[in-house]
C-alpha cells in the first residue's frame, strides 16, 4: 500500500523540524535533494524550507536565491552514489556480544545501486523472499571528491559529510547456502538501501550517537566512538582498495540491537545533528 499524500506531507514537515538551522559560523549545513514540479534540485535545509542551489553539490555550488517549502517537494536520496560500501563487524560492543574477533582490516560488501531508497517512502517486502527482514541503523560517510589511496591524515579533506542509513537485510538468506554467503542478495533487494534524508556537513562524527526506533520503541542506541575503524581510517583503507567517487556512501556498520520488521512497521534511524530517516515496511 502506497503512503497517502497526507502522510507524506506530514513526514516532510516533520523532516524540516528535526534539523537545526544551518550555521555559517560553524560550517554546519544540511544538504538535501528533492523533486519539485517535475524537476530535480538540491539545496540547504533550514527549518521547513529549502534554500535552493545550482551546479554541483560537491564542487562549488551556487545559491540560486530560490526558497522552497519542504512540504511542497518530494524528498530524494541526498546524493546518487556510484556505490555504497557497507561494513560488517565494525563495532566493539557487537563483536564482543557475537564473540567475534576484532578484524585486522575492514570487512565489507557492496549494496546494489537499485536498492537505494529515500526517506519517507515505503520499504517493500521482497516478492521472492518470505523470511525475516531486519533493520540496521548506521552512520553513513558521504565522499565529496574523487580519491584513491588517501592517507588517514588527509581523509577528512575528501569527506563531504554524514547521513543516516538503514541497511535493511534479508537475514535468513545470508547463510542459507552453506557454500556461499549471500551478502549481495540479502542486502540488495529493491528499497533495502535506505539513506538520508540529508547530508550533514561540519560535524565531528565521533561525538554522534545512533538510535533506531521501531514502532515508537528504541531498539538501538550506540556511540560512533565505539567504531573499530573510524571514518578517517575507513576512507583511507577503502580508498586504497578502490577509487571513491564524489557522492559515494560508506555505511559504517551497526551495533547491538538489530531486530526484525513486520509488514506495517515504522522504523526510524535517528542521529542527533543529522536528522531522522523514517520509513514504513510494507
Q: Where do the protein language model's features map onto the residues?
A:
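Residue-level recognition of short, solvent-exposed, well-ordered loop/turn junctions
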Residues: 86, 134-136, 245, 262-263
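N-terminal accessory regions of nucleic-acid-interacting proteins
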Residues: 148-162
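Structural signature of FAD isoalloxazine-binding scaffolds in flavoprotein oxidoreductases
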Residues: 102-119, 135, 268-272
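N-terminal non-catalytic cap/leader segment that marks the start of a structured domain
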Residues: 22-106, 203-205, 211-213, 217-218, ...
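Catalytic-pocket segment enriched in acidic/His residues
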Residues: 71-74, 94, 124-127, 171-282
